[in-house]
Design a protein with these regions (language model features):
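Charged/polar positions within long, soluble alpha-helices
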Residues: 72, 76, 138-141, 160-167
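Rossmann-like NAD(P)(H) cofactor-binding subdomain of soluble oxidoreductases
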Residues: 1-10
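Interdomain hinge/lid region at the active-site interface
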Residues: 86-154
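Internal alpha-helical scaffold of NAD(P)-dependent oxidoreductase catalytic cores
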Residues: 16-103
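Short, flexible, solvent-exposed loop/turn segments with mixed acidic/basic and small polar residues
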Residues: 11-16, 113, 165-168
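Hydrophobic, well-ordered beta-alpha structural blocks that scaffold small-molecule cofactor pockets
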Residues: 144, 151-163, 172
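A conserved regulatory-domain signal marking ACT and ACT-like small-molecule sensing domains
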Residues: 165-177
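Alpha-helix N-cap/loop-to-helix initiation residues
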Residues: 2, 30-31, 122
Length: 177
């Protein structure tokens, strides 16, 4: 899993695959020898090969890649729609907004195609996210301090369990420099 919100050759990086997970989804006809050879090739590029079924890949990426892009894009569009003529929201948007919406600058064509290809999994994850948002809204409306605290504490704890000492969320296993 590698990339950025920018596309095209001018935005390429020779370290793009360094310590990135490279998901392999071999079909039933792929021999163990071919899978091993390809895994070794991926490893030689500095990436971390991970073998998943196509179904696992599609569900996992719906949650950790596709939904975040949908959230970022919809948040940008929400703020754009709610902002006034003086564009105060746009003007004061700072680190938090910029961090969560950076990926909204990605290629609309690419993300349109991803959403059209992984519809079932995206819809499943999106339904669960909407369910969680409804619960959060109830907690806010009811001024449920305990539920709100649990929301932020649980998300902080899970997020803090992700190794972010290297670029991206992947742990730095080696240096290719």
């Amino acid at each position: 899993m590698a990339g950025s919100e920018r596309s095209g050759f001018s935005n390429s990086s020779d370290h793009l695959l360094e310590n990135a997970y490279y998901i392999l989804t071999p079909g039933g006809q792929v021999s163990l020898n071919k899978l091993t050879a390809f895994s070794e090739l991926v490893d030689s590029l500095g990436a971390i090969p991970m073998v998943l079924t196509a179904e696992e890949h599609d569900f996992i990426t719906a949650g950790v890649s596709h939904l975040p892009h949908i959230i970022a894009s919809s948040l940008v569009n929400l703020v754009s729609a709610l902002d006034n003529d003086a564009e105060y929201m746009k003007t004061i948007a700072a680190g938090g907004f910029r961090d969560i919406t950076r990926i909204a600058s990605s290629s609309p064509v690419m993300w349109q195609q991803i959403c059209l290809e992984n519809t079932k999994n995206i819809s499943t994850v999106l339904d669960e996210y909407i369910r969680m948002l409804i619960q959060i809204r109830c907690s806010v409306d009811n001024k449920d301090a305990d539920q709100l605290y649990q929301l932020f504490a649980a998300s902080r704890d899970y997020r803090d369990s992700i190794d972010v000492t290297s670029s991206g969320l992947s742990p730095k296993l080696c240096s290719l420099s």
